[in-house]
């Protein structure tokens, strides 16, 4: 870990818990002012803040035990000048529970300070204040206060949710103080545990840390995160679709999707488009593309892995099991496909006034374990039609698939030559599509690429370009000013507020939620809550959208550029250079988008 870098996942980790048994205060490590440039004001945790908290409780702290392996996080003098004794008790971490020697030393220290009357609080922290901290506090409760290990673990979890979240630590506590067979499973991890996902988890001395639930790598655990209560499709109940919340099935599905995509990161592995701007539009003349309408749907990958083993994976990496949905093998309709990974989106069609859920397949990565994602896009589209859609239709003809019993229908999404773009937006097509569409998707012919793909372009009318922010409503004021609520908008990978939004009565309910906003009349405007996402857009994504808003590719510019590409492809003499800036210039850009400075 870089010496001046904040610890991974520290930023939104809760500063402290509640007092445990009236004796211990668990907290994360404080960070001194030297880290302020990396930490927004509302996320800071200076030593002075601990002192102010104790004063608000009207309690004293006699001892602070620091379990980290470094002295770089804060100045111990800031603790000791408040009359608090500071003691460093280094515990390794990295998948190693506190040793018996660590435990005995901790208990002796605390017992000595606990003899004071009236008893004063003892503060305990490791990096995040959960595993090493919880382990030693629980050990003290058992050995010196005659608690059962079950009560100790449960009480700590209540005071510092979600409690000890490393499975190895829980098992070791129960091995020492109870029955290891009765050790509870690791709890569901909170969202802050999955931040800084591109970073290896290092402890304070630069060694690699372990994953929360076992001694395997933390990155593997991150792929198996669980968001309880995930909603499959907003606004409609889809029968036969249930969230997968148990291991090992959850992790197996997530890991298989990662492997099939060749994705070495964490989280959702699907290809992610970028916003079209005046620079990347030139890709349309540099390589072959197909175009389709951009549906206002919900992104899902689908893993088909045998009979009654069909799973949907959303952008939060939540997994849903789909029952009564069959995908027969074309060469033998009695067999079911397996090791097949599709990409697409769930949409809600309006048919005779009824809401009809459908899955539109627009790409395929694996077919019966074959890496069709490495083929060009035209071949992949043929594979979807021939190997996924047609066998289902054939089996329906025999009556062996009853569409009425399926939770939703499955269709291929059509792609066209880019010269059809105008008709998709302005012709009868837009009127005939029975679900919401909000732009165009330009798909290169090359192989499937997981993660952010700068070659896949999404075009939206400038009025519909949007950013997904995390909203944090904060009370702010200043000298001579009345305090007022301010909506701070945050993006991923940037600690400071990216922008602000006016707080309305409606907006208050979305505090700390992910919200989609558009830029209108020189300010950000709330559009909707993104219940399908737990994290905001990344900083680079947000900046790209802002660029599209302030310097947009209008519909007229897009059509003009495509027409020139078509003319050039036909060998006609170019009257104009292929540059979207030369004609049909957009109106003056709006005022500054409250971008970060």
UniProtKB/Swiss-Prot annotation:
Q: Which reaction does it catalyse?
A: a 5'-end triphospho-ribonucleoside in mRNA + H2O = a 5'-end diphospho-ribonucleoside in mRNA + phosphate + H(+); a 5'-end diphospho-ribonucleoside in mRNA + GTP + H(+) = a 5'-end (5'-triphosphoguanosine)-ribonucleoside in mRNA + diphosphate
Keywords for this protein: GTP-binding, Hydrolase, mRNA capping, mRNA processing, Multifunctional enzyme, Nucleotide-binding, Nucleotidyltransferase, Nucleus, Protein phosphatase, Transferase
GTase: annotated span: 229-597
> Where is the segment annotated Disordered?
181-221, 573-597
Q: Per its record, what are the GO molecular function terms? A: ATP binding; GTP binding; inorganic triphosphate phosphatase activity; mRNA 5'-triphosphate monophosphatase activity; mRNA guanylyltransferase activity; phosphoprotein phosphatase activity; polynucleotide 5'-phosphatase activity
The family database entries (PROSITE patterns) matched by this protein are listed as:
TYR_PHOSPHATASE_1, TYR_PHOSPHATASE_2, TYR_PHOSPHATASE_DUAL
Q: What is the effect of changing residue 315 to A?
A: Almost complete loss of RNA-binding and loss of GTase activity
Stretches assigned to the Tyrosine-protein phosphatase domain: 25-183
Q: Name the Enzyme Commission number(s) assigned to this protein.
A: 3.6.1.74, 2.7.7.50
Mutating residue 125 to A: what's the consequence?
A: Decrease of 55-60% of TPase activity
How's its activity regulated?
RNA triphosphatase activity is inhibited by vanadate, iodoacetate and magnesium.
Which residues of the sequence carry a binding annotation for GTP?
299, 315, 343-345, 458-460, 528-533
Its domain of life reads Eukaryota
- The UniProt annotation puts the region (Interaction with POLR2A) at 330-386
Q: One GO CC annotation, please?
A: nucleus
Q: Where is this region: TPase?
A: 1-212
Positions of the catalytic residues = 126, 294
Q: Name one GO biological process term.
A: 7-methylguanosine mRNA capping
Record localization: Nucleus
Compositional bias segments (type: Acidic residues): 193-204
Q: How does it assemble?
A: Interacts with SUPT5H and RNMT. Interacts with POLR2A (via C-terminus); this enhances guanylyltransferase activity. Binds (via GTase domain) to the elongating phosphorylated form of RNA polymerase II; can form direct interactions with the phosphorylated POLR2A C-terminal domain and indirect interactions via bound RNA.
General function of this protein: Bifunctional mRNA-capping enzyme exhibiting RNA 5'-triphosphate monophosphatase activity in the N-terminal part and mRNA guanylyltransferase activity in the C-terminal part. Catalyzes the first two steps of cap formation: by removing the gamma-phosphate from the 5'-triphosphate end of nascent mRNA to yield a diphosphate end, and by transferring the GMP moiety of GTP to the 5'-diphosphate terminus of RNA via a covalent enzyme-GMP reaction intermediate.
**Family designation:** In the N-terminal section; belongs to the non-receptor class of the protein-tyrosine phosphatase family. In the C-terminal section; belongs to the eukaryotic GTase family.
Please identify the protein, giving its name as recorded. mRNA-capping enzyme
Q: Whose protein is this, by species?
A: Mus musculus (Mouse)
């Amino acid at each position: 870990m870089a010496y001046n870098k904040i610890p991974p996942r520290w930023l939104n980790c809760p500063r402290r818990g509640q007092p445990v048994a009236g004796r211990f205060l668990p907290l994360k490590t404080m960070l001194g002012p030297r880290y302020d440039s990396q930490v927004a004001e509302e996320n800071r945790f200076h030593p002075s803040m601990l002192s102010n908290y104790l004063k608000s409780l009207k309690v004293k702290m006699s001892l602070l035990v620091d379990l980290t392996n470094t002295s770089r996080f804060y100045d111990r003098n800031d603790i000791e000048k408040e009359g608090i004794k500071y003691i460093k008790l280094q515990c390794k971490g990295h998948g190693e529970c506190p040793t018996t020697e660590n435990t005995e030393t901790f208990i002796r220290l605390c017992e000595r300070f606990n003899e004071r009357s009236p008893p004063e609080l003892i503060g305990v922290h490791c990096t995040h204040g959960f595993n090493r901290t919880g382990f030693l506090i629980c050990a003290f409760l058992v050995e010196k206060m005659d608690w059962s290990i079950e009560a100790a673990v449960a009480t700590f979890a209540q005071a510092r949710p979600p409690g000890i979240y490393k499975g190895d630590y829980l098992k070791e506590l129960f091995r020492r103080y109870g029955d290891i067979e009765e050790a509870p499973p690791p709890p569901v991890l909170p969202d802050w545990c999955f931040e800084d996902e591109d970073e290896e988890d290092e402890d304070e001395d630069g060694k690699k840390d372990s994953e929360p639930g076992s001694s395997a790598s933390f990155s593997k655990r991150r792929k198996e995160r669980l968001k309880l209560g995930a909603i499959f499709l907003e606004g409609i109940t889809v029968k036969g679709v249930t969230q997968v919340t148990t291991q090992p099935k959850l992790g197996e599905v997530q890991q298989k999707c990662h492997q099939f995509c060749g994705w070495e990161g964490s989280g959702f592995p699907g290809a992610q488009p970028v916003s079209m701007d005046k620079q990347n539009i030139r890709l349309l003349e540099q390589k072959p593309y197909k175009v389709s309408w951009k549906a206002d749907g919900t992104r899902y990958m689908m893993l088909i892995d045998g009979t009654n083993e069909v799973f949907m994976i959303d952008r939060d990496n939540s997994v849903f099991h789909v029952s009564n949905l069959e995908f027969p093998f074309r060469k033998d309709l009695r067999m079911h496909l397996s090791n097949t990974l599709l990409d697409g989106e769930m949409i809600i069609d309006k048919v005779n006034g009824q809401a009809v859920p459908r899955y539109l397949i627009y790409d395929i990565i694996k077919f019966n374990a074959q890496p069709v994602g490495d083929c060009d896009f035209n071949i992949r589209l043929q594979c979807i039609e021939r190997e996924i859609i047609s066998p289902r239709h054939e089996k329906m003809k025999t009556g062996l698939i009853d569409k009425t019993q399926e939770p939703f229908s499955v269709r291929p999404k059509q792609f066209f030559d880019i010269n059809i773009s105008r008709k998709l937006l302005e012709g009868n097509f837009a009127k005939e599509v029975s679900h919401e569409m909000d732009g165009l998707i330009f798909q290169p012919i090359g192989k499937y690429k997981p993660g952010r793909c700068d070659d896949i372009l999404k075009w939206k009318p400038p009025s519909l370009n949007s950013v997904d922010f995390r909203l944090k409503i904060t009370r702010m004021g200043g000298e001579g000013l009345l305090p007022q609520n301010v909506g701070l908008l945050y993006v991923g990978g940037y600690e400071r507020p990216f922008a602000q939004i006016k707080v309305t009565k409606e907006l208050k309910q979305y505090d700390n939620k992910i919200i989609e906003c558009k830029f209108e009349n020189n300010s950000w405007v709330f559009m909707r809550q993104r219940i399908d996402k737990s994290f905001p857009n990344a900083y680079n994504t947000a900046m790209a959208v802002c660029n599209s808003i302030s310097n947009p590719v209008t519909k007229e510019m897009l059509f003009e550029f495509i027409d020139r590409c078509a003319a050039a492809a036909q060998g006609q003499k170019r009257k104009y250079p292929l540059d979207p800036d030369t004609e049909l210039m957009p109106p003056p850009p709006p005022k500054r988008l409250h971008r970060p400075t």
